[in-house]
């Protein structure tokens, strides 16, 4: 059984990106820039934003964080986004979710220039993904990271049955569309399951590649997986654990101990898919810079 090490792959990718940024700087005299906007003081969001800024610095990219109070109006946020859309030094714009209730997330997503939407959430980028124009869009970072893992571990995907459990706009839907593409890392027959799917085990047991992104701790158990399947666990859930220092531990959507005994390859939680998300955000931002500069 292979443990798919996302932490290791993300470090390899960051090293590659650092070398690419150095080469771009030598050629163009400038580097990619990412601006992250955070509205309010959600503790988890603040941690994510700090990690993104740290990762940018590690590969030599410019990084700016705009911190706004929780009572920021939608109009004010839209003005900031418009200014960033017109700033040639900014190649990626990300508004950290969740946002306060007075701000409509879809309106904000629409306001970001699709050419700078390195999160891959804009409908134009999603539409290009569906149509197979991957060279002209940005793919949502978590699905993109999973594709990178499959490729780097040489997982055979062509013609395989991929079952995606979860239908979110951030992971499930783009993941299913990505696995349909005629790529070395995908080209699958795809089934998507969700909370209203009856007898879900009938579908998951057919999966050669099972991607769990449903947001429920230990939802996928050994009796739901066929022997030899490749299992990708997107979930990250807190469960109470009195023996842990913080009183909780992190688990995925897959019951790791049981499923890993059956799987041919599996991602752990933590250390699997999670580290890849920021790495792919960096990759998208570098790609944005290259497109703008015709490279």
UniProtKB/Swiss-Prot annotation:
What's the EC number here?
A: 1.5.1.5, 3.5.4.9
Superkingdom of the organism of origin: Bacteria
Q: Which InterPro entries match?
A: Aminoacid_DH-like_N_sf, NAD(P)-bd_dom_sf, THF_DH/CycHdrlase, THF_DH/CycHdrlase_cat_dom, THF_DH/CycHdrlase_CS, THF_DH/CycHdrlase_NAD-bd_dom
Query: Which cellular components does GO assign to this protein?
Result: cytosol
Q: Which UniProt keywords apply?
A: Amino-acid biosynthesis, Histidine biosynthesis, Hydrolase, Methionine biosynthesis, Multifunctional enzyme, NADP, One-carbon metabolism, Oxidoreductase, Purine biosynthesis
| Assembly notes | Homodimer.
This chain belongs to the protein called Bifunctional protein FolD
Protein's organism = Chlorobium chlorochromatii (strain CaD3)
The gene for this chain is: folD
């Amino acid at each position: 059984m292979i443990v798919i090490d996302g932490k290791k792959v993300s470090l390899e990718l960051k090293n590659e990106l650092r070398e690419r940024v150095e080469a771009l700087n030598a050629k163009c005299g400038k580097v990619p820039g990412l601006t992250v906007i955070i509205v309010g003081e959600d503790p988890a969001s603040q941690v994510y934003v700090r990690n993104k800024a740290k990762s940018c610095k590690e590969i030599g990219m410019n990084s700016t964080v705009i911190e706004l109070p929780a009572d920021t109006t939608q109009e004010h946020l839209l003005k900031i986004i418009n200014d960033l859309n017109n700033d040639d030094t900014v190649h990626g714009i990300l508004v950290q979710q969740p946002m306060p209730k007075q701000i409509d997330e879809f309106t904000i997503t629409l306001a970001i220039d699709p050419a700078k939407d390195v999160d891959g959430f804009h409908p134009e980028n999603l539409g290009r993904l569906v149509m197979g124009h991957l060279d002209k869009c940005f793919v949502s970072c978590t699905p993109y990271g999973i594709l990178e893992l499959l490729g780097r571990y040489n997982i055979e995907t062509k013609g395989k049955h991929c079952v995606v459990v979860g239908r979110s706009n951030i992971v499930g839907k783009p993941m299913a569309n990505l696995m349909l593409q005629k790529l070395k890392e995908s080209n699958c027959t795809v089934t998507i399951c969700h909370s209203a799917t009856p007898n879900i085990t009938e579908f998951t047991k057919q999966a050669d590649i099972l991607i769990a992104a449903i947001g429920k701790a230990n939802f996928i158990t050994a009796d739901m997986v066929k022997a030899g399947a490749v299992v990708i666990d997107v979930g990250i859930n807190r469960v109470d654990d009195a023996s842990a220092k913080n009183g909780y531990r992190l688990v995925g959507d897959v019951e790791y101990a049981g499923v890993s005994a059956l799987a041919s390859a599996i991602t752990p939680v933590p250390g699997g898919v999670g580290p890849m998300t920021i790495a792919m955000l960096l990759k998208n931002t570098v790609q944005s810079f290259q497109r703008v500069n015709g490279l």
